[in-house]
Amino acid sequence: QREIETPEPQGYEVLLKTVACGVCHSDVHIHDGYFDLGGGVQLPSPLPGGEPLTMGHEIFGEVVAVGEDVEGIEIGSKYVAYPWMGCGDCDLCNDDMTHYCANNSNLGIHVAGGYGDHVLVPDTKYLFDAGDTPDSLAGSYACRGLTAYSALKKAGPYTKDNSLVIVSAGGLGLLALK
């Protein structure tokens, strides 16, 4: 463990105090240094050059500071931090498809995430109101929630004449049932 300076937000950045941060199975792979693809095949994890990294991408936090260009975000408000961030310069990022960017800077995977006391979110567009979702679950919806939703959307359309089988009763499978 080491102490890391609390960042000071600039421009459109927002500093969140971590309220809750889920543990995703991807975090286990990143910690281990590889994704186990089965059959002895391993895909190296995306850790940046062996540098220490504060992991955690299922982030829910409270705004404690904002950059000078931020408008409409109040200190004390709580938000889910959308972790899937692109480079901001490529065609995909310019078309608001940052989650497909090959040069991404995902929170908790490529840049400091929510397992620390604070996380610096680069822009207010990555903050989402969690509504009445419990604090302990809110951040996980930016990962497991989107994963389950995306799978269901790709499997559709649904009618009374077709069926869908959800195999598994883990976090993703149970959320898909909701």
Pin down the residues of each PLM region:
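Glycine-rich beta-strand-centered segment in the early N-terminal region that forms part
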Residues: E5-C21, D36-D91, G131-T133
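Local cysteine-cluster metal-coordination motifs and their immediate loop/turn environment
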Residues: H25, M85-Y100
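Short Gly/aromatic-enriched secondary-structure transition segments
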Residues: H29-D36
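Short cysteine/histidine-rich zinc-coordinating motifs and their immediately flanking basic loops
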Residues: D36, C101-L107
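Residue-level marker of beta-strand positions
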Residues: E58, S77-K78, L92, H118, ...
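A structural motif shared across PLP-dependent enzymes of the aminotransferase-like
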Residues: D91-L92, H110-P122
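Mid-domain Rossmann-like dinucleotide-binding core that forms the NAD(H)/NADP(H) cofactor-binding site
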Residues: D117, D132-K178
